[in-house]
């Protein structure tokens, strides 16, 4: 196997360059040519000063002829551990002369030197003339916890649709060191009519104590490595079920996430690699809440399908990334998430029909001794005339099995967590919104 030499200045990062109250990033230029095909030369990057950061995110971009790009393997050695750069599942270009990698997340432990290597599996002599760069990103520190997710104003254009946009962490929070606001990072924004909701995974780290830093690292790679206008996804969800605002520009802004066919889609990315682990229940609950909001708002049938200007031309309205790409292009959103999409479609449909579209009455203290009481409820709930058929939280999770008969008219609900619930009575079309203390 031939080793390809990368020509670049050794980068030594000094303490004065690092201030973890703000993110830091470096673009390291790389060049290779035919004369160095049979010689070995690594790039050493002094990285001991990275200690104190939550993680180091590294991505790679190489441009050459298609034979070079397809036949080369790019690796990074750090502390005797070898990381292989995998072609980005997000890259939406068909140009085979460009290699863009997924992000590699390095632990923030002392790394005396990094060594970047490129090796060719093709032993034939061919002309080499390629260039590129290594992108290194360190997030701002996470000593201050995430700002509490904001409760957005209702943005539904349908008076009969009551699915709310979930609370979320805004761009100005996770993207504060980029000075992000609600606008797209590089204007102009493009807009589309959303008909299909596309689910992704980040294929990155599964653990972090700084998830908003992970979101920022994806933004940095999408803008500086991929060369996009902004982060590609419209929304992102971390393993704790926290929702993050993605691409700037507002509702129905066209993203960059769907194999080059981004029209008529919304992209939501669950943070993690779901070829390796399974998404958490908190992530899935938030995903359902978000999909229900958008499907209801746009009158999209959650369990339906229709034509789309993308491969294969006809897709489920809630689909995985790989459904809209040519065969074997990507495994995104990972097998452990993809296999849950059938049930996600049905659960989202039920969320819409039982919570979002049902006529709703908010119970308050003046409704005492009406159909449902007391208001607010605490340890018990009563209805003099009807059985309770459904007791559902705002995520669409059914709690009716937790209702225990207290007497003829009342139920013990002490085991149910506090929060907002939707209550339905047998034989009644109306849904009641009730707060349980």
Give short role names for the model-derived ranges.
Residues 420-437:
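C-terminal tail/sorting-segment detector
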Residues 353-382:
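Residue-level detector of functionally pivotal "anchor" positions at catalytic/ligand-binding pockets or at interdomain
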Residues 41-52, 70-76, 82-115, 119-125:
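Beta-sandwich interaction modules
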